Amino acid sequence: MKLSLSPPPYADAPVVVLISGLGGSGSYWLPQLAVLEQEYQVVCYDQRGTGNNPDTLAEDYSIAQMAAELHQVLVAAGIEHYAVVGHALGALVGMQLALDYPASVTVLVSVNGWLRINAHTRRCFQVRERLLYSGGAQAWVEAQPLFLYPADWMAARAPRLEAEDALALAHFQGKNNLLRRLNALKRADFSHHADRIRCPVQIICASDDLLVPSACSSELHAALPDSQKMVMRYGGHACNVTDPETFNALLLNGLASLLHHREAAL
């Protein structure tokens, strides 16, 4: 699996691994790269079965497999310790990494994540699956922004959304891979294991997220023994894209604080 690694800004700079959501594309984090790369060595990647890491995924593909294959390729690249920033599905992969490789994960940042899928989120995905079956990739892609962005943000950026739709359709991961990744997301349940995650965790959520209710992050915060929660009042599910200034400030401050907190505890 191919990774994209930025040059370390200084010797022994901490490593931050960015894990996107169901779309799987490393480019999702473009609004964060410039600021993160000033302080950290940043790892981005297209998840297996998407983008420049094409593959046919098994029917029983799981979050645990996503975590294992990422950890293995990081170790192969000489990276043994790393912070994880995960969005939605990426936050699930981050929690799995923290459980399975506790000596490697220094800090976890969960963006609009959850312990187990909420009934509302499941309903949203059921609607999207019906669109996929009835209208194919184009229907899935055209509906996706409705679940990601606030309405006023979309209305002011119609040409941009049209360009994003065309790009997403051209690089669509394929129906089978998408459904197998979605099923892995729906099966994931950390409600009985979250208290075993010992690394410090920053939880960021948006109160206007249409896809994942912010209450999911409150449940996550209550379940994680060493966590702090920040709420963005605006931004939707893709709040790091729609309001990068607010998000980046929260992320940079959180990473610096939690990494310092971890070092002080060692």
UniProtKB/Swiss-Prot annotation:
<dbReference type="GO" id="GO:0016020">
    <property type="term" value="C:membrane"/>
</dbReference>
<dbReference type="InterPro" id="IPR050266">
    <property type="entry name" value="AB_hydrolase_sf"/>
</dbReference>
<comment type="function">
    <text>Involved in pyrimidine catabolism. May facilitate the hydrolysis of carbamate, a reaction that can also occur spontaneously.</text>
</comment>
<dbReference type="InterPro" id="IPR029058">
    <property type="entry name" value="AB_hydrolase_fold"/>
</dbReference>
<dbReference type="GO" id="GO:0016811">
    <property type="term" value="F:hydrolase activity, acting on carbon-nitrogen (but not peptide) bonds, in linear amides"/>
</dbReference>
<comment type="similarity">
    <text>Belongs to the AB hydrolase superfamily. Hydrolase RutD family.</text>
</comment>
<dbReference type="InterPro" id="IPR000073">
    <property type="entry name" value="AB_hydrolase_1"/>
</dbReference>
<dbReference type="InterPro" id="IPR019913">
    <property type="entry name" value="Pyrimidine_utilisation_RutD"/>
</dbReference>
<dbReference type="Pfam" id="PF00561">
    <property type="entry name" value="Abhydrolase_1"/>
</dbReference>
<feature type="domain" description="AB hydrolase-1">
    <location>
        <begin position="14"/>
        <end position="115"/>
    </location>
</feature>
<protein>
    <recommendedName>
        <fullName>Putative carbamate hydrolase RutD</fullName>
        <ecNumber>3.5.1.-</ecNumber>
    </recommendedName>
</protein>
<dbReference type="GO" id="GO:0019740">
    <property type="term" value="P:nitrogen utilization"/>
</dbReference>
<dbReference type="GO" id="GO:0006212">
    <property type="term" value="P:uracil catabolic process"/>
</dbReference>
<keyword id="KW-0378">Hydrolase</keyword>
